[in-house]
Design a protein with these regions (language model features):
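Extended C-terminal regions of large enzymes
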Residues: 1-3, 129
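Active-site-proximal alpha/beta segments of enzymes that process anionic O-linked groups
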Residues: 3-91, 183, 188-194, 199-208
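Membrane-interface soluble catalytic domains
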Residues: 7, 19-23, 117-123, 138, ...
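Short, solvent-exposed loop/turn segments at secondary-structure junctions
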Residues: 17-21, 83-88, 133-137, 144, ...
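A long, amphipathic alpha-helix that forms part
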Residues: 56-74, 89-131, 185-187
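Polyampholytic, low-complexity intrinsically disordered segments
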Residues: 85, 103-106, 226-228, 234
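Short acidic, glycine/proline-rich loop/turn micro-motifs
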Residues: 90-98, 141-144, 172-175
């Protein structure tokens, strides 16, 4: 039994899509053990069509559907949102016209900001984590042009992670973690939060203690085309059967 189950937390799944492309939902069930049903999209209006033609719903509407589904009695839930409004290939519904990245990014940020303001006003104790899958390659470099992701370069694989506590008093100001971290640090932060008693005891949350000595991870990125690693202050790339060479950004 995982720490989530031992602590009495109920898992939930909310997507802005149907989860069928490349069997994403089934993969979560098979490899991550996430068994709850996917929250329905009843009453939600599509704002984009995905590259496979399936509907993509408003980020804010999906977040509101989570909030509206919360039981009136306090309960512990841990929710995975998977939001693909920024995926390449998204199009205007019914027209097939491609959409620029910037207005979609601005809309997503507005939706997230609105949702965070609503969380703040609600007083509900929440830890919100925003973890991008990868960068959009808006800018190119000396090896790979903009929008291409054939090589998992640092511009694509090094993404910021955002964590914010709502409804809890904290003893520390905003903290920036600039050490090399990965999903291991995110998982450790969640585990520490659950076991800290912050949600069951009326005591200030010590962010410094919560984030100190999080696991560090060397930068290693790989796909079917290439591998990219960081050694000291430089990045190196290996293309399939070729030798390692400097990745010149």
């Amino acid at each position: 039994m995982c720490i989530r189950d031992r602590a009495g937390w109920t898992p939930q799944l909310f997507f802005d899509h149907n989860g069928k492309f490349e069997d994403y939902l089934d993969s979560l069930r098979k490899y991550a053990g996430l068994k709850p049903p996917l929250a329905p999209h009843t009453g939600l209006k599509p704002i984009y069509d995905g590259f496979d033609g399936s509907p993509i719903y408003s980020t804010l509407d999906v977040l509101h559907s989570w909030k509206n589904a919360l039981p009136s009695e306090p309960t512990r839930t841990i929710t995975l949102f998977n939001l693909i409004a920024l995926h390449d290939g998204n199009r205007t519904p019914g027209s097939g016209k491609s959409l620029d990245f910037k207005p979609r990014a601005e809309r997503l940020l507005r939706d997230l900001n609105t949702f965070m303001n609503e969380l703040e006003a609600s007083g509900r104790p929440v830890l919100l984590l925003i973890v991008p899958e990868h960068g959009a390659a808006v800018r190119g470099d000396r090896i790979q042009m903009a929008r291409l992701r054939e090589i998992p370069s640092p511009h694509i694989t090094h993404v910021p992670v955002f964590a914010k506590f709502f409804g809890l008093s904290t003893k520390s100001p905003e903290i920036v973690i600039d050490t090399p971290t990965s999903h291991l640090a995110v998982g450790e932060l969640i585990a520490r939060t659950i076991t800290s008693g912050a949600y069951t005891h009326a005591k200030p949350l010590d962010l410094t203690a919560l984030t100190s000595n999080l696991p560090q991870t060397w930068s290693v990125s790989e796909n079917s085309n290439a591998s990219v690693v960081q050694y000291k202050d430089n990045f190196w790339v290996k293309l399939q059967q070729s030798k390692w060479m400097p990745y010149k950004q």
